Amino acid sequence: VGEREVTSVAIFDRDGTIVDVVRDEETGAVTVAFHPDQLRLLPGAVEGMRSLAEAGYVLAMATNQPAPAKGQFSADAVRRTNDALVERLSREGVAIAAVEACMHHPQGGPGGDPSLARACECRKPKGGMLDAIVARLGADRSRSWMLGDSVSDVQAARAAGLRAGLVFADNRCELCPLRAGPVGLAPDAHGATLAELAGAILRRG
């Protein structure tokens, strides 16, 4: 009997990692895409994802989307937007093998779905979504990555026993300390774009 092939998975956060956040031109408020027309791929995103796929990584996505719990928009809107992103990436030659979206929020909000207003094990910084993807794809945790743009993405990687990759630009001052520590939160690789981050990951071997 031959050895079972081990899968290395690269799990991506969505907003701020693959696609840009949405900014209200009048108020300056920042939110996330809740309609396919709002999806804007970030520079280097497709290039970085392709590089990892060509190196043998299976690609997946794990995203916190608490808006249905908070009454901001519907669960269907989240699903449609995620589906549209997966289709868009497919047209760019990037296949996404699994998607997990946590729609819970501990407090919820006015008009939100009360069934989603609760503490859960899937919302990052917990590792539940990553655990689900690893189990579904039969991945080797020691060879797999969580790639995101926030402290919670690094924490989720640690919780699930994965390596952590961080995307951040120099103007994201709240993330700069992560380059050096604190202990346990320093990412294993980082870059200003997904393309740069993918290069750093592949150079590690």
Predicted regions and their residues:
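Active-site flanking residues adjacent to catalytic metal/cofactor-binding acidic residues
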Residues: 12-14, 63, 148-149
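Hydrophobic residues in well-ordered beta-strands that form the structural core
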Residues: 20, 61-63, 166
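Conserved Lys-Pro-Asp/Glu-containing loop-to-beta segment of HAD-superfamily phosphomonoesterases
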Residues: 113-154
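Acidic, Mg2+-coordinating phosphoryl-transfer loop and its flanking beta/alpha structural elements
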Residues: 145-189
